[in-house]
Structures are given as structure tokens and as C-alpha cells.
Amino acid sequence: MRREAQTRIEGTERVIKDIDRTKLVEQQEESYQTIQSFLSKAKEALSARDLQRAYTLADKAYLLANELARSLPSR
């Protein structure tokens, strides 16, 4: 479970690193901030060895990040 959570965290970070926050509309910015919050909490849970919580938060962040990325115009 630890590996799965870490993989989701890393996957989310890969997705959001290419997002230009200056081009986000308000709703997209809110989603971006939610993703960052989920990531932060997932990392905290991982550090606390709360693996189920870490995975759940990381998975939510991952799904939301991919949804956000799909909503952006192609480069």
C-alpha cells in the first residue's frame, strides 16, 4: 500500500508540474489548490504510516489532477 500511495503522489506531481497556473480560471485554480492540499495531506499520512489514508488522498489528488489537465487547452 505504501508503494501505491507513493506512486499516486509522484504521478500527481508529474501531471501538475506542467500546468501554468497563470492561465487557470477561478474554478481551475480552486481545483489546483485542492490537489495541492490532498497531496500535502497524503504525504503527512504517509509519514505517519497511515497508508490507507495516504493512498485515498493521493488517489483523489491524482484523479482531480488528471481531470484538471484534460480541461485545459492543448499546447
Q: Where in the sequence are the language-model features?
A:
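Short, charge-rich amphipathic alpha-helical segments embedded
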Residues: 26-38, 46-48, 52, 56-75
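Amphipathic, heptad-repeat alpha-helical segments
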Residues: 1-33, 75
